[in-house]
Amino acid sequence: MGAEARLSRQRAYRKGHRGEWLAAFALRLKGYRILAHRFKTPLGEIDLIARRGDLVAIVEVKARPTLGEAMEAVSFTAQRRIDAAADLWLSRQPDYARLSLRYDLVAVLPRRWPVHVENIYAAR
């Protein structure tokens, strides 16, 4: 891998990490408790898992220039991977039977507060 490609990947990683931190901060201010950051499974990765009461939000974080681009960035393939990872996470929870699950998006936009889109799959 060339030095330029490595630098580009490092920048993207840092940008993603900052975006996830900002998204988690915004969700905390809305009363959510962050249960996991970058939850990895063999089936996929979840950026954030947040909980408020009996509601668990599986949160995809996207840093894009516009909200529309952020929403479009969650492809059908990504949805399937996120669903599979969420099912695995949920199956490991002792109180899973009483939890409601929702898939959300937090769009990190330039020079703006993060936008929280609840129930991203239905919002399309």
Curated annotation (Swiss-Prot):
Q: One GO MF term, please?
A: nucleic acid binding
Which positions, given as ranges, span the membrane? none
Q: Which cysteines are joined by disulfide bonds?
A: none
Superkingdom of this protein's organism: Bacteria
Q: Where are the coiled-coil regions?
A: none
Pfam families, A to Z: UPF0102
Gene3D superfamilies, per the entry? 3.40.1350.10
Q: Entry's InterPro entries?
A: Restrct_endonuc-II-like, tRNA_endonuc-like_dom_sf, UPF0102_YraN-like
Which family, according to the similarity comment? Answer: Belongs to the UPF0102 family.
Q: Which NCBIfam families match?
A: PRK12497.1-5
Record-given protein name: UPF0102 protein Meso_4010
Organism of this sequence: Chelativorans sp. (strain BNC1)
